[in-house]
Amino acid sequence: MATATPSGPRSSGRRSSMSTPLSPTRITRLQEKVDLQELNDRLALYIDTVRSLESENSLLHVQVTEREEVRSREVSGIKELYETELADARRSLDDTAREKARLQLELSKVSVEHQDLQASFSKRESELESTQARFRETEALLNSKNAALATAQSENKSLQGEVEDLKAEIGQLGSALALAKKQLEEEILMKVDLENRCQSLIEELNFRKNIYEEEIKETSRRHETRLVEVDSGRQVDYEYKLSQALSEMREQQESQIGLYKEELEQTYQSKLENARLASEMNSSAVNSTREELMESRIRIDSLTSQLSELQKESRAWHDRMQELEDMLAKEKDNSRKMLAEREREMADIRDQMQQQLNDYEQLLDVKLALDMEISAYRKLLEGEEERLKLSPSPSRVTVSRASSSRAVRTTKGKRKRIDVEESEASSSVSIDHSAAATGDVSIEEVDVDGKYIRLKNNSEKDHPLGGWELTRTIGEASVNFKFTSRYVLKAEQTVTIWAADAGVKASPPSDLIWKNQNSWGTGEDVKATLKNSQGEEVAQRTTIYTTNIPEEEFEEGEEIFEETAKEFHYPQQKSGNKNCAIM
């Protein structure tokens, strides 16, 4: 290694040269020596500069390496986060699309049910209107019957008043009849008394007549005795006078007796006639009263029968009206209950639709937020790529439907110096589904989120699944669902067994809820098997997740690091080789 020459000999040489003359050869050598010293000084300075530059270069290389590692980690983290969020966004969009399709189907079903309910409701309304019309007709008829009943009751009251009047009149006539009977009895007693008096008078008259005859006989006997004494001349005159006087007395007595008898007979006949007339009048009044009473009784009986018939008819109409009112109340209650139930169902459906709309809005908000974040990440990456002068290529997402797998690939541009080149096919995650069935029932679908498993009857006949067991295995963990003994899967129909936390209502026989299990479980390798009641496996379905990293990624990574190493290390090695050559 060249070193600097001390200044002492150089000054002494100069002094000696000044003191003694130098030859041209000496001057040339001295000049060459001075040039060599200057070259050595410049070389030493260059070596020091190269060493300092190498140390700075090594420090810069370390810093660049650290920054590149940090950058690569940040880019890989951002890329993974972006890819995971993008995959989650796509998954959520797929779930949203499936949920939207399912909700559209449910909405169509609900709309059909709503139309059916509206038709049944309109039918019930028409029936209710017809029932109300019949009720109004019945009510009008009942009102007419009530009016007729009121008129009949008023007539009955008037007839009862007449009956009371007739009863009062009958009482008066009865009292008059009793009075007439009493008078008749008194007249009869008076007649008997008068007859007795007449008989006693006749007997008294006969007795007096006998007494008179006896007196006459006694007088005649006396006169005879006197006549014996009287002369025969005056006897004839005396007898004539006596006979005349006797005849006069007899006529007077007979006339008096006749008058008295006639007077008695007239009095008796008049009283008897009066009594007979009074009796006839009383009997005619009683007969007329009896006839009127009979007519009144007949009329009362007819009115009573009519009243009873009207009351029976009124009770029948009242019962019918009560029955119709009960039927109408029941129909109203049923209609009200049906309307309340339908309104509650519509409210539930509206709540579900509102909840689904809210979920849609939340999903749309999440989607918009993800889109905004993705656009922000894209702008950030584009800004970094523009700042680092990269040539970016658009990302690409491929979905393989034929093999039932999904692959997410992103392409990245090639960077200079500290930028990292990423391959076009960086990574892929595939989901492979395989299914097999030995019978008519197959496992149609297994949800990757563990919400449901769907079975399908591929035959044209109903298939009983009583005692069948559905098992889902993830690694070493497994869950079992057993069908009830009476369950039958209809021909060409599907049945979906939902987990308890799937948020779906039970709708047998197409949708069943496993209340004891919140989720079917999620994982990378999923296997679902269906066994019959004898324990034989009749169907299975397997879902396998596969992550592939292509060889081009490693090769391109090696090329990236080789180019980076060339860019950073080769200039240093070249400078070192130059230094060594110079040395």
Swiss-Prot record:
Post-translational modification Phosphoserine, affected residues: S23, S393
Taxonomic superkingdom: Eukaryota
Keyword Coiled coil among UniProt keywords: yes
Ranges where the record places region Head: 2-34
Localization, UniProt: Nucleus lamina; Nucleus envelope; Nucleus, Nucleoplasm; Nucleus matrix
Span list, region Disordered: 1-25, 387-436
GO biological process, one term: heterochromatin formation
Stretches the record annotates as Linker 2: 216-243
Stretches for region Linker 1: 70-81
Region (Coil 1A): 35-69
Domain LTD: 429-547
Miscellaneous comment: There are at least five different lamins in Xenopus: the somatic lamins L(I)/lmnb1.S, L(II)/lmnb2.L, and A/lmna.L; the oocyte germinal vesicle lamin L(III)/lmnb3.L; and the male germ cells lamin l(IV).
Name the UniProt record assigns to this protein: Lamin-B1.S
